[in-house]
Amino acid sequence: MSDYHSFDLFYYGLAFDNCAIMYVNLLFILLSLLPLWYNKHPKFQKIVFWVYFIPNIIAYATNFIDMAYYPFSKSRLTTASFAVIEHEKNIAKLIVPFLGDYWYLFLWFFFLIGLWIFLYKRVKVQPAPITSKKIYYSSSVLCFLGFGTLIMMAIRGGGFTSDTRPINMLDASRHVNISAQADAILNTPFCLIRS
């Protein structure tokens, strides 16, 4: 990365990070923003909890897998990578050494997931009385439309200019001098979703 400033790579990577976060959390955001009078009910919040954590843990796990995968492949994990793994004949023999070599990644992953769930549960959603349904629904619709616009901007790479469409993996190469540096801009969940 010496030929290009690391800060610039991280800056351009934010567009791809935001896009992946929006894709992974779209259902959670939708359930949280819909103007439903029962969305603060404990049973509904339990559903929202699982809708949030199941896709996020899967996406988070792909990043940890890529920490071990990238040094060997020199590319981000994509759906094509799974096609290669699918045809691997000695995968069972490789799993035990993999677990032994990368035990610290598993430990770190489960520690961070536990911390994430602990912190999530510390935020208590309290039912608030709805004094005026008209104000509640109109403010909810405005929030929904406002956040919907921001989500679309994130998925499109940060704006609504005429050349901006939903970004893809090739867009990362527009921001680098050396094509190998595009991997520093990309993230694994984004690559899996867009490949």
Regions found by a protein language model. Name each.
Residues 1-194:
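Transmembrane and membrane-interface helices of multi-pass
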